Amino acid sequence: PVSASANFYSLGTHAHKLACFVTGLGIRELAADVSRLVPGRKLDDNAHILLRFENGARGMLWSSQVAPGNENGLRLRVYGEKAGLEWSQEHPNQLRFSPVGQPPRVLSRGGPSLGPAASRATRIPSGHPEGYLEGFANLYRDLAEQIRARRAKRKPDPAALLVPTVEDGAHGVKFIHAAVESSAKNGAWVVLTA
């Protein structure tokens, strides 16, 4: 059985956090197949995970270091009753929005149809590449706002509270441990502890 997780610690935690953040849902339980596909590797390099969210929604997560042609390849797809969303880190300025019964639309970063939170995260005019480094700048800005608010004994700007917390990090570690446990039990469903 897999006793530690290299691929999943470095890649899967990001996909896990992204799915929970975008949907606003926590994961209740999972069933995982964490494996070593490259002969001689001591730690995993591939994981397939089935997810059950707290509202009953289903999901799946694939995390791999053995998928040639993918440059990091972090991608999120969310489907609901009214629409689907698709985002890829390899094309971070675009969000594919597919309402049921309508043609899909591509929403661009900095475009007029975006809400306040998306506009706040945009640092440079649309048409210019933006993403990875600016994402860190947004985190630092929001953390600085929280620190300033605490020192001034005031409430921070609500938009600055969207940054990951220590609790989010702890939940990510629990997610990894549950996936490793599930895989060691041949993909049995494991309940995530709160």
Segments from the language model and where they lie:
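A general structural signal for well-ordered alpha-helical segments in protein cores
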Residues: 15-16, 139-144, 176
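C-terminal hydrophobic helical "lid"/dimerization subdomain
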Residues: 170-183
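C-terminal glycine/acidic-rich active-site capping loop/insertion
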Residues: 21, 29, 48-53, 82-163
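C-terminal capping/lid region of NAD(P)-dependent oxidoreductase domains
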Residues: 181-194
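Predominantly a Rossmann-like dinucleotide-binding segment in NAD(P)-dependent oxidoreductases
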Residues: 1-41, 47-48, 95, 119, ...
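Glycine-rich phosphate/pyrophosphate-binding beta-alpha loops
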Residues: 13, 39, 62-71, 128-131
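Short acidic/polar mixed-charge low-complexity motifs
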Residues: 26, 55-57, 66, 81-84, ...
